[in-house]
A protein has these predicted regions:
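Alpha-helical transmembrane segments of secretory-pathway, organelle, and plasma-membrane proteins
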Residues: 2-507
């Protein structure tokens, strides 16, 4: 790759993935939220590859990126972050930072391994027998890693794993380690330089990025406000800076850079891998009928998964207290809802919730990945666009609420758009183009998020003003609003800059 294109890739991917990781934490979170930065990496790698067959079939790489980043989101890290930042001096700074390096290493390393394994699969570098071996071994070794490294855990009985980076939460990084080992060992056996080098680059930058991001967060919380430099004091969370978001965006920036460096180091290997993709002019299923049948079954399962969003589980008093503490509800709302709240969730709901939670990695990661690997074009198409829209529509339209007045219309609009995207992509095999897909990943996500967040922010501000006995002019109210919501405003101003850059780079 020429130096100009390589430079452009790096300049594009840093702000793009920095934004995407920050948006993950803002809107969706968890495994589904991680699909956005993964898809962003895949999209930009395809676009800047300057290889016609890859650019024409960019959706394959965006889809692989989305499902490859998913599994890392299963790791718990809130209490891990707390080890180094919840107090001054830190409870255990060394352990906290080492833990973040390990978790960042595994998250991005596994992303790189799955992503490049998928590329090898769609390019027929891995045979169907080899893929079956990978699909068979990975879950088993992952489960073994989970039980070896993350069990036993019983807080009440004071039983903890030998290597433990939290206080009370169940960790799962051992499962990711097991899965990563399977893919890397297989790549070593196959002398697959693409997977080995790309994964290592992603892993190192992911680990380092999380440590540096956390150091920025610690500085923002505990040290920036005492700095002699006025510039440094601006980064204090006491001055309205969202220190958590700084950590997320730094991690995203480094993770994106690691993927870019890994791709540049393996560019020649990547080109050699593409022979069969060029020969077949895109994805060619091992068996067209089987691929179609499995795709239809997957879609039916996705529709079935939507049912749990419409089953209203009774809320517990403990959950209500959490909502009140996080200011998600007012004191008045808490008093009213507490009358209907239950002490414990009925057993039937618990079983159903547990089932839907456990089935999601299969529906949103394992099945689409396998289908793409066996050549399902339909799966690649909808996993690059429809699936990314679906997960944000689920979170904003069905998990969160706006106001009683706008809730139903907003849900209907999101539902209609979701269905329309699905029909357009499946019936007409429409890929929405690189620029169209990038617009969804950036301004599409931001627009949907701001509908929810903007209405919520204004509503809370109005309630605060009504409680106040002071009289304010419009100018004073505007200043109060800005000061009260400075973290939100600064974060989304940063997002906007990153989004504009991301779109401009792919025009």
């Amino acid at each position: 790759m020429d130096i100009i294109t390589a430079t452009l890739l790096i300049l594009a991917i840093i702000p793009a993935v920095s934004y995407a990781w920050g948006m993950r934490g803002t809107t969706i979170g968890g495994e589904k939220g991680a699909m956005l930065p993964g898809a962003m990496i895949g999209l930009l790698i395809a676009f800047f590859s300057k290889i016609l067959i890859v650019q024409e079939h960019f959706y394959i790489f965006a889809a692989l990126g989305a499902v490859s980043m998913y599994l890392g989101g299963s790791m718990t890290y809130g209490e891990t972050l707390g080890l180094s930042m919840n107090q001054k001096p830190a409870e255990n700074m060394k352990k906290g930072l080492i833990a973040l390096f390990i978790k960042g290493f595994l998250w991005f390393g596994l992303f790189g391994a799955i992503f490049t394994t998928g590329i090898n699969a769609v390019c027929y570098t891995y045979s169907i027998i080899e893929l079956l071996i990978i699909f068979a071994l990975t879950p088993g070794i992952a489960v073994a890693g989970y039980f070896i490294f993350n069990k036993p855990l019983n807080v009440k009985e004071n039983k903890f794993p030998k290597i433990y980076f939290s206080k009370t939460r169940q960790e799962s990084w051992g499962a990711l380690l097991g899965a990563l080992l399977v893919l890397i060992v297989f790549a070593i056996i196959k002398l697959n330089v693409l997977t080995i080098v790309f994964s290592l680059s992603c892993a190192l930058f992911g680990g380092i990025g999380w440590v540096l991001g956390q150091l920025f967060q610690i500085y923002s919380i505990h040290y920036a406000h005492n700095s002699k430099s006025s510039f440094c004091r601006r980064f204090s969370n006491k001055n309205g800076v969202d220190s958590w978001k700084i950590m997320e965006c730094v991690l995203g920036a480094f993770g994106g850079l690691g993927a870019a460096v890994g791709f540049l180091l393996t560019y020649d290997n990547f080109k050699l891998t593409l022979f069969n993709l060029e020969k077949n002019d895109g994805l060619l299923p091992y068996n067209k009928i089987l691929a179609l049948v499995l795709f239809i079954i997957w879609v039916i399962l996705l529709v079935g998964d939507m049912v749990h969003y419409f089953i209203k589980r009774p809320i517990t008093k403990k959950e209500l207290k959490k909502q009140l503490k996080r200011k998600q509800i007012t004191q008045e709302q808490y008093a009213v809802k507490r009358l209907k709240a239950v002490t414990a969730v009925p057993r039937g709901y618990e079983i159903y919730d547990s089932f839907t939670e456990k089935i999601e990695p299969v529906l949103y990661c394992a099945i689409p990945f396998i289908l793409i690997c066996i050549g399902s074009k339909e799966t690649a198409l909808i996993s690059s666009f429809f699936l990314l829209f679906l997960v944000v529509a689920q979170e904003i339209g069905l998990e969160k609420s706006i106001t009683k007045k706008f809730n139903l219309p907003f849900k209907i609009v999101l539902g209609v758009v979701t269905l329309a995207i699905f029909i357009i992509q499946v019936v007409f095999s429409f890929d929405f183009s690189v620029i169209g897909t990038m617009l969804l990943y950036t301004f599409g996500y931001e627009l949907i998020t701001m509908v929810w967040l903007g209405v919520k922010t204004v509503r809370l501000f109005r309630k605060d003003i009504k409680k106040s006995t002071e009289e304010h002019t419009k100018k004073e109210l505007f200043k109060l609003f800005i000061n009260k919501n400075k973290p939100i405003i600064t974060v989304h101003a940063y997002f906007t800059i990153c989004m504009i850059l991301s779109v401009l780079f792919v025009i």
